[in-house]
Structures are given as structure tokens and as C-alpha cells.
Design a protein with these regions (language model features):
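Conserved ABC ATPase signature
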Residues: 201-205, 209
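ABC ATPase "signature
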Residues: 23-27, 35, 283-287, 295
Length: 335
């Protein structure tokens, strides 16, 4: 049972497609992949073609966010080694790597949850305190985060108006009618009807709708930078595409910058302007989307890309046959 179509292509003999509890169609894998009969199935198969257009950003003298030679540890265990990155206003920087590569630790360092043992974090050219508890309310407001699992990020007992309204009150001082009016605007921005959703609780929403609420809550603080930590990994591919399109539209409207933490190559290919590749806590590759995806690849980057499952039943067999003992990497078995 999965929403990952590429995994289905490798593992299944037959495929059953469901929509809202009803069977859409059932067939053997080869037939389903090559010639789906129903429109819904065809739409599922087509989602991996989404791409944003490269942005022509204005020349900027300094990055919005900069990490300089940052190192960090959990106790005696080092997790980041000499990590540097730059992110500009209105730009999307994707940080990609396998599990344990340091992606989420980088996000924790930026947000002040993981103090660096060396190096510094600069925001708009000014050093940020290493510990979030030492940061001003204004510094906290400017950097917001959208988490991987909305069910753990949203208070199940609160109404949507309270969830989105809290940062409006905390950061901007909005209360009462002014707060509710702004919540309604934010719901419209994420394409949810305020009249329907404002008084609901998270348990009454679908997974995609919950993630949109998380987006609205982040936007409520009026941030300049949003860190997106695996924001589509818990969603089926059709819903995930809708979330990526929404984030792209919001960026075009507001000029917000995104730091995308992901292990999904398709997401990077779809939305990134710049790409940072991490392995074992180090940056091993960096460049524009075009540069990173144009061969020849750096060795580890090439291994990551070749490990991206394809909607082809023979893909895994071909991949395993192509990997010799000299070029295989056991650490990528989970990718």
C-alpha cells in the first residue's frame, strides 16, 4: 500500500488504483504503466513532469541567509563539517542527500535549535545568535518552518482559525476581527474556502489540506525565508504536485525565499533554483539546477540521481546490473 508510483513499478505484479474509497481500475503492472485507461490514473502518471521556470532574480549584493564554515555536533557525535551556503531573496535552494547526510541538522542549526560548534549563521548580513532563545522576536519572525508531518505539527484540539491566528497575534499583534480577517486572507491564499475551513479542526482535513494549513501558519508571520523540511514526502504525488505549485505561486507573489530539505530528486528537479548536495555532514556538490542535473556529475551526485526510482518495471534490474563492486555504495541502499 503506497502512494509512491515508482516503487509500485518495481515491486507489484498487479496494480489497483483507488480514489475516495472506490476502485478506479485494476490491471497488470506493465499494462497499467504503459496504457492507463482512466483519467485519474493518467493524471497520477503525469505528475512527475512538473517543473518551475528558472528565475531571473535581480542582482543582490548580499545573501538573505548565509552559513559560513559551520560545524555542529549532537553531544560527542559530529553531524556537520564545514558547511557553507548562501540563499538570496526570492530564491529556492534545495538541500538534498540520503538519510543521515545532515540536511535536517542544517535546518536545525539555521533555526537555532542546534548551536554550531564552529562557524556562524548570518541573516541579511548580520550574525544570528546561535540559540533561538537568544534571538529577538523579529529575528524569529523572519525565518519560519514547514514540517514533514502535519499531523505532528498541528494541535489536534485547536480550530484552524486559532492555529493560523496564533502567529498573527504573537508576531504582529493582531486580535479579534483583524486577526480573523487576516486568517481568511491566508486561507484564500492557500486555496481553501474560509467559510468552510476556518472553524474546523485538523482531524477534519485531508493530509494535503493539513499541509496547506501549515503553509498558511508559516505565512502568517510574514517571513522572508521559509524552511520546507520534506514537506511533500507524506503526500501522494498528485497532492504533492499541488503543494509545490502552490509554494511556487506564493513565491512569485510575495518574493519569499525557500530552503527545501529533501531526499526526493524529482522535487529538486521540479522547484530548485540552486542545489546543495550533502553526504555525511559535508557539502559535496553545489550549483544551479541546470549545472547539477547536466552530466558529467560529481560521483556521489551521480549515484543519488541514478538511485531515483523510475516508473519502469525493469529499472531496478538494470541499475543493479550496471553497478560494479568498485562503483557501488552501500550507504545508498536506502535511497
Amino acid at each position: 500500500i503506497t502512494h509512491d508510483l515508482a516503487v509500485v513499478a518495481q515491486m507489484a505484479d498487479r496494480i489497483k488504483v483507488l480514489l475516495k474509497g472506490d476502485e478506479v481500475e485494476t490491471s497488470d503492472t506493465a499494462s497499467m504503466l504503459s496504457a492507463p485507461q482512466e483519467d485519474y490514473t493518467k493524471s497520477l502518471w503525469a505528475v512527475r513532469s512538473f517543473r518551475t521556470e528558472p528565475k531571473a532574480l535581480p542582482q543582490q549584493e548580499k545573501p538573505l541567509l548565509e552559513l559560513r564554515n559551520s560545524c555542529a555536533s549532537y553531544g560527542q557525535h559530529p553531524v556537520l563539517h564545514d558547511v557553507s551556503l548562501s540563499l538570496y531573496r526570492g530564491q529556492t535552494l534545495a538541500v538534498i542527500g540520503e538519510s543521515g547526510s545532515g540536511k535536517s541538522s542544517t535546518a536545525r542549526l539555521i533555526t537555532g535549535l542546534l548551536p554550531p560548534t564552529y562557524g556562524e549563521v548570518l541573516y541579511d548580513g548580520q550574525p544570528l545568535p546561535a540559540d533561538f532563545r537568544q534571538r529577538s522576536k523579529e529575528q524569529l519572525r523572519r525565518i519560519q518552518m514547514i514540517y514533514q508531518i502535519p499531523d505532528t505539527a498541528l494541535n489536534p484540539r485547536q480550530r484552524i482559525v486559532d492555529i493560523i491566528g496564533r502567529p498573527l497575534t504573537f508576531y504582529l499583534g493582531l486580535k479579534g476581527k483583524a486577526m480573523r480577517a487576516r486568517v481568511a486572507e491566508l486561507l484564500e491564499m492557500i486555496e481553501l474556502d474560509p467559510a468552510i475551513y476556518m472553524e474546523r479542526q485538523p482531524r477534519e482535513l485531508s493530509g494535503g489540506q493539513k499541509q496547506r494549513i501549515c503553509i498558511a501558519r508559516a505565512l502568517a508571520a510574514d517571513p522572508q525565508l521559509i524552511i520546507c523540511d520534506e514537506v511533500t514526502s507524506a503526500l501522494d504525488q498528485l497532492v504533492a504536485e499541488g503543494v509545490l505549485k502552490l509554494l511556487n505561486r506564493i513565491q512569485q507573489q510575495l518574493g519569499v525565499a525557500y530552503l527545501f530539505i529533501t531526499h526526493d530528486v524529482a522535487t529538486v528537479r521540479a522547484i530548485a533554483d540552486e542545489v546543495l548536495v550533502m553526504q555525511r555532514g559535508r557539502v559535496v556538490d553545489h550549483g544551479s539546477r541546470q549545472q547539477i542535473f547536466t552530466p558529467p556529475h560529481q560521483d556521489y551526485t551521480g549515484l543519488l540521481f541514478s538511485s531515483e526510482p523510475q516508473m519502469d518495471p525493469d529499472w531496478l534490474d538494470r541499475l543493479l546490473a550496471s553497478r560494479t563492486p568498485q562503483t557501488s555504495n552501500p550507504s545508498l541502499e536506502k535511497v
